[in-house]
Amino acid sequence: FRDVKQSDYYYDAVKWALEKGITEGTGAETFSPHASCTRAQTVTFLWRAAGSPEPTGTVNPFSDLSPNAYYYKAVLWAVENGITQGTSADTFSPDATVTRGQTVTFLHRAAGAPSHGGNAAFLDISDNDYYFAAVAWAAQNGITSGTGNGKFAPNAVCTRAQIVTLLYRADN
């Protein structure tokens, strides 16, 4: 991709994600590393990283989830595995952007919500935050080192480069 250089921190992660079939580019020559990820994209990346397992159920719990959508099976799988519950009782909001806090929480749940020891070690993370355990686990396991200056930026939009990097580090 012309927008991914060998010197970019996410170069190996993008290469890995392509080789594993987790994602493709956004065009023939572009990956769009700085583009934001949607809830549908993030859940799909997680599902593909897990080997694209077939969901066991066929009941669609969301009014905004089309059976024809590329992410349909990924969302069903994510709900079945407790990775997400949607944004309300009957909506998934597939096109909503996902934050770094949400993404790490999804990843933590996909990994079976392993326990962590200690704190999240970031100035902008409190033990009262819903994503505290996920961020602490990710930091302690080398999955994230934050965004710099002791911060994680949990409310910042998660980019394509960031999601594939988190997945890559979790897999290695």
Per-range role (PLM):
Residues F1-Y9, E24-K73, E80-G101, R109-A134, ...:
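Feature responds to low-complexity, polar/acidic, surface-exposed segments characteristic
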Residues A13-V14, A74:
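Ligand-recognition elements built from short beta-strands and adjacent flexible loops
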Residues T105:
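Alpha-helical segment that forms one wall of the substrate-binding/catalytic cleft
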